[in-house]
Amino acid sequence: PTLWELSSPMFSLPMTEYAQGLFETVLEEYEDLELNPSGRDEFMTKRQNFPFTDPERSVATYEELKATKKEFPELRNLPAVGGFDFASTRDFIAVGALFKVDGDYVFKSHSFVRKEFVDRIYSYSKPNENVNGKRRFAPIRQWEDEGLLTVLDEPSMDAQHVVDWFVRMRDEEGYEFQTICGDGYKMREYLQPKFEEAGFEVSWNGKFEEPLGYRVEVIRNFRAIDAQLSTVIEDSFANQKINFGDNDMMRWYTNNVLRHLKKDGNVEYIKKEDVRRKTDGFKAFEAAMFKADLLNEVDTTDFYDNLGWFMG
């Protein structure tokens, strides 16, 4: 802090009343970096006039991704926020349910992929693990066998698959959806009619009349939420507070995301490569994180302690 006057001359002594107030604000942000290291790039760009020299990196490190492989807790009857990515009907669609349990963001996801696309790009229908001497870029058939995705032999994937998944999670798995969030792109012509036919209310302003479990909230400017959510998402990865369960496809999705720091200091999430490196699952996760504040955190330790007292 004693050197900040080099980048901000107003911090030279004696400081004006305005400069003193700003200095205290910047000092608080600087001290917060110890707990929230993901904010370093933005701090250096916005507060020190020193653009970060490497503006692009993965959203999570290899070790942070490994740490997302945890056993799922019991999720039935817990509050959840749904998220989906429906940007393209001709390659991948992703859906998911977000929970908060014992401080962890727990995300259960599923994907729908179009057969023609995965045949052409990932050699899905070829029997061998290696194609032309090279290991498959994405093991689609393995993930299908593990129940992580559904391969659809359709010319264009029907939005009904998205709606049916959320209905099934609500009615059969007992997830208590506070809301379901997704991008407004293709909403009016594809998704909204399907959701409404199933009894959901689709809101473009965050206001609802339907009860919980029947609400879909449209994120009108999905690109803008990257900067809004980047700190909580990246700090959750860094502190090993994200649980993707036994789902290597979610780790693959996340590993394909490039964190790009724009010149204005804001973060945006982009693909590392447009065709093969899909990010749909991460975008569904991000959509759910948009309303993570609706989740009442569940402490299973207290639950089992109370259960033991009751049974004793």
Model-found features: residue ranges?
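Metal-dependent DNA phosphodiester-chemistry modules and their immediately adjacent helices/loops
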Residues: 1, 198, 203-299
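Non-catalytic, compositionally simple segments
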Residues: 1-81, 90-92, 110-113, 121-154, ...
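Short, surface-exposed connector motifs at secondary-structure boundaries
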Residues: 170-179, 212-215
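Flexible loop/turn segments at secondary-structure boundaries
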Residues: 54-57, 88-93, 103-105, 115-119, ...
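Acidic, low-complexity intrinsically disordered tails
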Residues: 303-312
